[in-house]
């Protein structure tokens, strides 16, 4: 687990440079994080789509890609011809866990659910088009959650979620803190009770041995609750990220529209059409006639100041 700290720190540090629009340094740091642990590549497609969605950064986007792929090739190429590197890294049995959850369609046709859900999330992120940095963080947090929660991942992988969960709690208050708190309790209790090698420093024995919690059914229920809490947090992160990505804040702030034109040009007709479209409960109409000193249909209107 402690070896996951280095790639996670490098990855989060790279994101800070994305926030500062220093894409060249970010590209190098992302390459370093992937070289430290290949699983960090999970978040890179979201970063690429984020940079691509900002039309004003084409040149910087190209620089990011050049430095990212160039640095990654520089770090990895010397080891490509090593049998030990191929066996321990490229053929690591931990990577096969993403294929453990599947639907058997018969005739040796399997639908692998973890890659499928990841691709659907990536497609959803791409279709939003205009993406802000908060939604980038949210989507990557959900992507890492998908890989971790839908595979029998070791405890160290959960370190990938710590920065995202910490940011989520700091921004969204009590509800987020409660969910992450319950998830943490379920996680610690599960590995304390059911994972070999777990030990308690306070008590002088390696694993708590309570017969009722050692049964497969209780263990499975415990694991289901832990994964369920993790998915609830992922849904909450994605929901808040989409809500904050509302570019013009149309869902939270009223919008003012000014309709101008000569008399008889159809201003009132257009206003009534908008009111019908959105509903009278959602529209407040302020007419210029409301600011006249005299009604337009009485003689004073034509022989005095109108306003």
Which stretches of residues belong to each language-model region?
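Conserved nucleotide-sensing/catalytic segment adjacent to the nucleotide-binding pocket
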Residues: 284-287, 293-307
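Walker A/P-loop
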Residues: 268
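The conserved Walker
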Residues: 263
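Multi-pass membrane glycosyltransferase architecture that uses lipid-linked
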Residues: 1-91, 108-253
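Short hydrophobic/aromatic beta-strand immediately N-terminal to the Walker A/P-loop
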Residues: 256-258
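Post-Walker A helix-loop "phosphate-sensing" segment adjacent to the P-loop in P-loop NTPases
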Residues: 275-285
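N-terminal intrinsically disordered, low-complexity segments enriched in P/E/S/T
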Residues: 96-101, 303-305
